[in-house]
Amino acid sequence: MLCSNRQSSLDFQDLLFFLLLCIWLFTPLASCVLQAAGNDTYPKWPTRWDPLFYRVLQCSAPFWGFVADRFKKGKAVLLFSVLCWVVFNCGIGFVKPAAMSCVSVDPTVQSPVNFTNYTHAGNHTRQRRYLTEDAYANPPLSQPILAAYRPHSRYIRSANTNTTSAPFRNSTVDISMASNLTTMSPSATKVPLKSTSTMETQAITAKVKQYIIIFNKEQVDTIFLLILLVIIIGEFFSAPAVTIVDTVTLQYLGQNRDRYGLQRMWGSLGWGIAMLSVGIWIDNTHITIFIQGLGCVLPDYKNYQIAFIVFGVLMTSALIVATQFHFDNRAYQSDEEEDKKEDVEIPQVIQEVSSPESSSDDAPVCPETNPQHFPFKDLFRIICGVRYGTVLFVAWFMGFGYGFVFTFLFWHLEDLKGTTTLFGICSVLSHISELAAYFISHKLIELVGHIRVLYIGLACNTARYLYISYLENAWIVLPMEVLQGLTHASVWAACISYLSAAVPPALRTSAQGILQGLHLGLGRGCGAMLGGVFVNFFGAAETFRGLGMASLVTLLIFSLIQWLLGQNEEKKGAMLAENIPVPSSPVPIATIDLVQNQSTSQPNSDSKSRKTRHQEEQEDPNKPAWVVSASPWVTIAFALYQIRDMVAQTKNNDCQGQQERSEQQTSAAPPGDESTSSQPNASSSPVEYAFQGPASSAFVPQNTHPVRPVAEPPSSTEAKEPVENSTPLPGHSKPLPAITQTQPTTH
């Protein structure tokens, strides 16, 4: 499954923008919708169990990855997955909530007491009476407590009115406030009244009735099972969307897969814009829900259907963009051939499938007549190895931490008196840091390598978790929110690029599905679910502290394993170098043609012998793309050493050139001996080569015999002598002039 060359990066950016915008817009608001549908009856249910359904069900992504790779139906699976996102998740937003009713809570103290006081006509002294003096006559209460229960009211007195009734009052008085009230003493007044009766009625309520809103439990259970069924089916069929998009994006990038972050950043940008705009829109909406009964204070309900409407529109746009993708199944074979030529794609698979002696130059394979098929057992052999298995474990652990922070960070900050404004600022900083991290991820990977990016992510996680665990003021968490980009965005980009370079193109969708299932599915699901259990038993701060220590231990173990793997590779390379057959003698043989060939090939062997291990690693054509690159300071130091070696080599070449000129002048024969120089030269050549190496004596009879019939001029032999000694081995450059000078004197 590969996009054709007509594809443009704008299509990938648009699809990632709409797709990830909708997914991350729907995920946080799903819990709010479940609460509004009646899940308040089950406290904390959305916080602990909802992430499990949304994350663990992402483990279906490997299954759909296998289907897309096996049947070469990548585009069909992608379109069907996006369509399932639209159908199933939009349906959740239109589920009607359960019926609500308002009921009262039984009061814990005495019900209202009505007291009626009748006065008879006549002139007499009337004293103000209080409810507490009669209601609590046995046993008598002290004066301060009585003062708290005396009503503060005025009596309307009129001599011309037949009946005067005091206003009916309901008052709630707390006994603990008795000491703060002013004590009132009974007052006596003389009021002349006619033959009438006055009725005084007062009602005192010790506590106002409390009313709560309850949901119909049967309807809540029905809605819960319905939403659960929709989530399970929808997530199972919609899980491979992100996996296939990531795979197609990586295959479009080709050898520039490190630039995946530049494409992925558009998804984070869309997420931030959508959460900000839709959140403000929902906050400004108010809806009224019918509640049976009276007495309840109507809560302020928000219209969360807006989020699902926006989700449906934007996901439909993503579906339209996905139809513009062109998948070419035949491109698998050409991609494999291209990867073999550049020797950077699948080193592990090539070493295990092909023999070490075969090469593409010796046996070229036509992709149309003899394509290579990689079974799934090769994929499992790769990912189950120590090198890639540890990387996948780190991906799961980072997903575990991200799921825990995503679920319980704001909970912990709320316990520290954090406000919603703080939560908004934290979200903005997190999105900005992710955008920046995705934008520079390829530069960071080129600078330090994939494995060291994982080191940095684990170290930042350790510092972030430990810092949060010791917080006393919620606002000082803001500096650590900047690390969100390094702990999530950079690690995710490095894992995708690293694993993509390790598997053949035909299995990349399956590999990306496994990575997504471990990081986004199982990792974040376990972080949300197990995090809730740990928070209940130990508390939020202690759980953050324990997670920070676990991150530190993971960093140490992972770095130790990678170091041991590097040592084993060096030992294997040394053993292979020892087993390479070396010529018995690199000394040139006494023939003109062989002298010329050896003279041209000797500088290469000399330069190779002077190369350091760092230079060999940099110039190794079999070096995979995922191997950790050298540090910048090592490269600078190596460049300085190279410059120094070049300067020293030029000086040595000048000295050797002067020595060769002097040797030519001293070893040149006199002109009078030209007639008889052919025979002595033929006899002297074996003597010269006999002293040049232990293996050259075996070639003396063979090489000197064909040379004798050829009457070559002395000038040609003299011209070849400097070529033979142009690059002599160490230890052989000085004896040669002495041998050539003493040879004529022996005759």
UniProtKB/Swiss-Prot annotation:
Gene3D superfamilies: MFS general substrate transporter like domains (1.20.1250.20). Residues 597-625, 652-747 are annotated as: Disordered. Residues 675-685 have a biased composition (Low complexity). GO terms for biological process: antigen processing and presentation of exogenous peptide antigen via MHC class I. Its main location: membrane. InterPro entries: MFS_assoc_dom, MFS_MFSD6, MFS_trans_sf. SUPFAM superfamilies: MFS general substrate transporter. It comes from the Eukaryota. It comes from Danio rerio (Zebrafish). Belongs to the major facilitator superfamily. MFSD6 family. The keyword 4Fe-4S does not apply. The gene is mfsd6b. The chain crosses the membrane at residues 15-35, 75-95, 222-242, 271-291, 306-326, 391-411, 420-440, 453-470, 485-507, 520-540, 546-566. GO terms for cellular component: plasma membrane. Residues 597-606, 652-668 have a biased composition (Polar residues). It is found in: Membrane. It is a multi-pass membrane protein. Keywords: Membrane, Transmembrane, Transmembrane helix. This is Major facilitator superfamily domain-containing protein 6-B.
